[in-house]
Amino acid sequence: GGTRSEVVLASRNGELFVVRRSQREPAALAWELELLDGLADAGFVVPRPVPASDGQLSVEGTWVAAFRPGRHPTAPDEWARVVRLLAELHRFSIGYPQRPGFASSADLLERSAGGDVNLDRMPRAGVAAVRSAWAAVQTGAVSVVHADPGPSNILVGEDGSVALIDWDESRVDVGWFDLAAVPRDVPLPADTPLSRDAIVTAGVAWEAATSWVAEPDYARRRLSQLRSRQA
């Protein structure tokens, strides 16, 4: 589920569905659902929105997708498939428009807010730390990023297919943020121009900033971790 939306499992005529109540603004939610619909059309395994009877993809912030069984990745070869899938996502979505109300890490080097980030609420030293980490990864193409591809948001099917679920935090940014949570024993793409440490540090910085208002205790732990990585 996550901390920024409500998720329940529902059944209709013996078929299981996931019902999500989003807290996003209508334009931001519409962007997410249109993205998912387009990715599903392109062959990505994602939660495709089930339209309501009038054809709308959401009704007052609530939307529905078919339930997909699966387990979270554990083995290195499963994570290697995840890495390939993320790289494919990034290539596919180069040039995609930014999510309404959101900002990329590059934007936030100058701006103070976008999406779940509000740097005005953070201490000045914390803002300097996260911006330093983000500045270090500003290379390569800008594309859609899932933005939270940890194991709980990845499902491996019985057929070996890999599904990315819970796109609530997705935005447009440099793709390296999606690689920050890849286990250390799993290689990153061979053409990655950045060090793994720089990518992980940028990811820690993003988690600190994006959680500062909604999950302050967690955010402070991540900021402490960031400072240790930068020391």
What feature does the model see in each segment?
Residues 136-143:
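Protein kinase catalytic-loop region centered on the HRD/HxD motif
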Residues 73-124, 142:
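A cross-family kinase active-site recognition segment
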Residues 143-144, 156-198:
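Active-site Asp-x-Gly
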Residues 144-146, 151:
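Catalytic-loop of the protein kinase fold
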Residues 1-12:
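ATP-binding glycine-rich phosphate-binding loop
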Residues 184, 188-231:
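Helix-rich C-terminal or lid/interface subdomains of diverse kinases
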Residues 61-76, 110-117, 205-220:
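A glycine-centered beta->alpha junction motif in the catalytic cores
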Residues 20-61, 72-89:
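A conserved alpha-helical element in kinase catalytic cores
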